[in-house]
UniProtKB/Swiss-Prot annotation:
Keyword Isomerase carried by entry: no
Modified residues (FMN phosphoryl threonine): 176
Swiss-Prot/TrEMBL cofactor(s): FMN
Assembly and oligomerization: The complex is composed of six subunits: RnfA, RnfB, RnfC, RnfD, RnfE and RnfG.
Enzyme Commission numbers on file: 7.-.-.-
Protein name, UniProt field: Ion-translocating oxidoreductase complex subunit G
Biological process annotations from GO: electron transport chain
Top-rank EC class of the record's enzyme: translocase
Main function: Part of a membrane-bound complex that couples electron transfer with translocation of ions across the membrane.
Keywords: Cell inner membrane, Cell membrane, Electron transport, Flavoprotein, FMN, Membrane, Phosphoprotein, Translocase, Transmembrane, Transmembrane helix, Transport
Gene transcribed to yield this protein: rnfG
Primary localization class, coarse: membrane
Organism listed in the record: Aliivibrio fischeri (strain MJ11)
Entry's localization field: Cell inner membrane
Length: 210
């Protein structure tokens, strides 16, 4: 009986070692491809929120990490990608969190030109209700296009609210919390850029190259 148990333990140990080795080998073989795919996804999103005609630098490499919980919605440092055209600063793509979504955090990226006018907004991740709150996703509706061409005039700019709250942005039938959260997050990100642009341009590039 004892011999049988030892054999079983040995078989299990060998199986665990083999499984670990397989996972390690698989990771080693695929990590470069995964990193490449992530880089391509990032490039695609950056070019959607900061149009190609607005920059000629490698935007994903011109990245700084900024920590500002009030403006960017996270205690963690968030990436800001600095655009330039013909050697001059021409805008940015700012990642931020809307912490007050209906189902939790909504991660967004906001593109602006050097005058803090919005050039694009995309939702990077969310857990909002399908058929209701998920209309913030560009793959579902073009709702985020309502931000295009707009800027924030002050931290108290009342236009930056959903219509139910007296602002200019549509809410969704049966889902006001989600668009309200996104509008507030975009507003904070744009205002942060508008009031800190000179400071941001003095910071060293400190993101890991993706």
């Amino acid at each position: 009986m004892l011999t049988t148990m030892k054999k079983s333990s040995l078989v299990l140990a060998l199986f665990a070692i083999a499984a670990t080795a397989l996972v390690t080998i698989t990771y080693a073989l695929t990590k470069d491809q995964i990193a490449y795919q992530q880089q391509q996804q990032l490039l695609s999103v950056l070019n959607q929120v900061v149009p190609k005609e607005q920059h000629d630098n490698e935007l994903y490499k011109a990245c700084i990490l900024v920590k500002n919980n009030d403006a960017l919605g996270s205690k963690q440092a968030m990436p800001i990608y600095l655009a330039s055209l013909n050697g001059k600063h021409s805008g940015a793509a700012i990642e931020a969190i809307a912490p007050d979504g209906y189902s939790g955090n909504i991660k967004i990226i906001v593109g602006v030109d050097s005058d803090a006018i919005v050039t694009g907004v995309r939702v990077l991740s969310h857990q909002e209700t399908p058929g209701l709150g998920d209309k913030i996703d560009i793959r579902i509706t073009r709702w985020v296009d309502a931000f295009l061409g707009k800027t924030v005039e002050s931290s108290e700019d009342k236009n930056w609210a959903v219509q139910k709250d007296g602002g200019q942005f549509d809410q969704f039938t049966g889902a006001t919390i989600t668009p309200r959260a996104v509008v507030k997050a975009v507003k904070r990100a744009v205002w942060f850029y508008k009031t800190h642009q000179e400071e941001l341009l003095t910071l060293p590039l400190n993101c890991e190259t993706k």
